[in-house]
């Protein structure tokens, strides 16, 4: 076994980003700066849920990874498959142990999110559209968990809704982008089943719904710092229109949506901090 493989299988860069989004969810909901202890706990619970999910995903995907990603820890023999399972379970347990310090609601929410990461890797991942929705739900759950960690939801609820909708759109675009490889692997993604054009239209619908939803925080008095959301909406609309006109633009579109999501999170944070201004 390779010691570094236990870090590698977590995919720490992704988990750190998820933890930061959890913290941003706390800040947006709190409309200020909560205690460092709570922010630290939110970060760790989100990080461990993400890392456990990545580990268990590699456990279930071992046969596919032997073909597509042979350099990953399990296929190359750096971590025995059974050890990876135990390692994932350990991370889940550590995360839940920490979540209890944030209260019952935060603990139960973490338990549900952790369970979804396991079920997704085990059964949902290959299912057309359902797998896309599961990923989007987990993405949306991150800022909500941050909000629960500080005892209120507030504007983080609107952030979560927008995150869910835009990530359904993005996940479908990613499936359009990967259609050739997925067909060779015998996968049954939405674009393979209904075609790239129809899948692009569904992706576009979720993009437009995101833009519509982004106006809801204005009704509850979000601050002027929310103004960059106009740029976000323009980026989402352009990507949504482009993918319908030309499904081959899905690769560029999903990257655009990723950048737009980051700007949106910052917009929500600035809007929360300037509320009443």
Swiss-Prot record:
The keyword RNA-binding is annotated on this UniProt entry: no
Provenance organism: Pyrococcus abyssi (strain GE5 / Orsay)
Role: Prenyltransferase that catalyzes the transfer of the geranylgeranyl moiety of geranylgeranyl diphosphate (GGPP) to the C2 hydroxyl of (S)-3-O-geranylgeranylglyceryl phosphate (GGGP). This reaction is the second ether-bond-formation step in the biosynthesis of archaeal membrane lipids.
Stated name of the protein: Digeranylgeranylglyceryl phosphate synthase
GO BP, sorted A to Z: glycerophospholipid biosynthetic process
Swiss-Prot/TrEMBL catalytic activity: sn-3-O-(geranylgeranyl)glycerol 1-phosphate + (2E,6E,10E)-geranylgeranyl diphosphate = 2,3-bis-O-(geranylgeranyl)-sn-glycerol 1-phosphate + diphosphate
GO molecular function: geranylgeranylglycerol-phosphate geranylgeranyltransferase activity; magnesium ion binding
GO CC annotations on file: plasma membrane
Similarity comment text for this entry: Belongs to the UbiA prenyltransferase family. DGGGP synthase subfamily.
The protein's annotated pathway: Membrane lipid metabolism; glycerophospholipid metabolism
Compartment list: Cell membrane
């Amino acid at each position: 076994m390779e010691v570094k493989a236990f870090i590698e299988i977590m995919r720490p860069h992704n988990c750190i980003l998820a933890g930061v989004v959890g913290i941003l969810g706390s800040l947006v909901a709190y409309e200020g700066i909560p205690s460092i202890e709570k922010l630290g706990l939110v970060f760790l619970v989100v990080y461990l849920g993400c890392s456990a999910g990545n580990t268990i995903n590699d456990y279930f995907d071992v046969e596919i990874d032997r073909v597509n990603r042979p350099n990953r820890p399990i296929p190359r023999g750096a971590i025995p498959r059974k050890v990876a399972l135990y390692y994932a379970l350990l991370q889940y347990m550590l995360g839940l142990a920490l979540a209890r310090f944030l209260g019952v609601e935060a603990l139960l929410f973490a338990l549900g999110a952790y369970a979804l990461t396991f079920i997704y890797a085990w059964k949902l991942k290959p299912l057309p559209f359902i797998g896309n929705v599961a990923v989007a739900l987990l993405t949306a759950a991150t800022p909500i968990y941050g909000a629960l960690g500080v005892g209120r939801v507030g504007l983080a609820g609107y952030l979560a809704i927008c995150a869910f909708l835009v990530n359904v759109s993005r996940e479908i675009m990613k499936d359009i982008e990967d259609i050739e490889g997925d067909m060779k692997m015998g996968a049954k993604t939405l674009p393979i089943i209904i075609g790239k054009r129809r899948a692009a239209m569904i992706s576009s619908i979720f993009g437009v719904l995101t833009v519509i939803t982004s106006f809801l925080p204005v009704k509850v008095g979000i601050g002027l710092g929310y103004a960059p959301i106009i740029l976000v909406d323009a980026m989402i609309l352009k990507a949504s229109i482009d993918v319908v006109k030309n499904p081959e633009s899905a690769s560029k579109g999903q990257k655009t949506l990723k950048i737009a999501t980051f700007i949106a999170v910052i917009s929500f944070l600035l809007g929360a901090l300037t509320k009443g201004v």
